[in-house]
C-alpha cells in the first residue's frame, strides 16, 4: 500500500552564507545567553520574527483606513502583546519592525523559569523542564521553547508530582529517610 505524503510547513531557514564570522559570533552569544541547544533553535526564532515583520511590512504598504490593514494589523498587534513581545504602549505596526530576536527568546519557558528563580542557571531550567518538574497553570510542560503568554507568566510553578513541588521525594532523600527510620527502630529495641 502506498504511503500518504505528509505536508509539513517550514519552521527554520538556514543562513545563505554558512561561515559568516559576525553572524556565527552573534548566534553563539544567543545560545550561551538563553541556554539554547543548537543553532537551529536560533534559526527557528529568526524565521518566526521574519514572518511577523514581513506581515507588518505588507500591511504598512496599505492605506491607513484600509479595512484589511485595520483588521489584520490589530490581530497581529494583539497577538504580539498577548505573548509579551510587544508593549501595550507601542501598539503600532511601526514598532513591530523594531522587534529583535531577543524579544522572542525572552518569552520562552526556559528563560522565564530562570528569571523567576526556580532554577539555578539557564541550563538548569532546561533540565527541570525536560524532566517534567515545571507546570504552567495545571498543565505540565516539557518543551523549553514553549512561548509563555503574559497572563500565564504568574502561574509558572513546580509540578505537584515533582519532588520540588511537594510530591514524592527523590531517590537519595528516600534512602536517607529509610536509613533514619531503620536506625531509630534499632535503638528502641
UniProtKB/Swiss-Prot annotation:
One of the GO BP terms on file: translation
SMART domains to which the protein is assigned, alphabetical: Ribosomal_S4
Protein's cellular compartments: Cytoplasm; Nucleus, Nucleolus
Region (Disordered): 161-189
Gene Ontology CC terms, in alphabetical order: cytosolic small ribosomal subunit; nucleolus; small-subunit processome
InterPro entries named in the record: Ribosomal_uS4, Ribosomal_uS4_CS, Ribosomal_uS4_euk/arc, Ribosomal_uS4_N, S4_RNA-bd, S4_RNA-bd_sf
Cited SUPFAM superfamilies: Alpha-L RNA-binding motif (SSF55174)
Keywords: Cytoplasm, Nucleus, Ribonucleoprotein, Ribosomal protein, RNA-binding, rRNA-binding
First and last residue of the signal peptide: none
Highest taxon in the source lineage: Eukaryota
Molecular functions per Gene Ontology: rRNA binding; structural constituent of ribosome
Pfam families listed in its UniProt record: Ribosomal_S4, S4
Domain S4 RNA-binding: 107-181
Listed PANTHER family: 30S 40S RIBOSOMAL PROTEIN, 40S RIBOSOMAL PROTEIN S9
Quaternary structure annotation from Swiss-Prot or TrEMBL: Component of the small ribosomal subunit. Part of the small subunit (SSU) processome, composed of more than 70 proteins and the RNA chaperone small nucleolar RNA (snoRNA) U3.
Similarity comment text for this entry: Belongs to the universal ribosomal protein uS4 family.
Described purpose of this protein according to its UniProt entry: Component of the small ribosomal subunit. The ribosome is a large ribonucleoprotein complex responsible for the synthesis of proteins in the cell. Part of the small subunit (SSU) processome, first precursor of the small eukaryotic ribosomal subunit. During the assembly of the SSU processome in the nucleolus, many ribosome biogenesis factors, an RNA chaperone and ribosomal proteins associate with the nascent pre-rRNA and work in concert to generate RNA folding, modifications, rearrangements and cleavage as well as targeted degradation of pre-ribosomal RNA by the RNA exosome.
Name the UniProt record assigns to this protein: Small ribosomal subunit protein uS4
Lineage: Eukaryota, Metazoa, Ecdysozoa, Nematoda, Chromadorea
